[in-house]
């Protein structure tokens, strides 16, 4: 909101894993923008990407999978989050509806934040 800006924003993409320092910093953010790049099954089935690229995507120097991102968010007992934006979804190896379905569980746990998934094709937010 322009007239009531958040105290802090964390923008976390292009990680193959989340170091402890990043884990601690994102806990304090009011707005969190986080990647959920690929579905492991869709990545494995993708015929366009060579094996070496798939290995890099899955590595510590690659991207976070849907499962990794969900587990990261689910691991916090408390945070300052007001809004979470899940983005940087692969157009070929992920699906907005799949991500929305998986992350619905976070909102069902009595959390006070809103979760949005950003469509990679339209850039539109989908409220989870």
How should each PLM-predicted stretch be described?
Residues 1-31, 126-128:
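Core dinuclear metal-dependent hydrolase active-site scaffold
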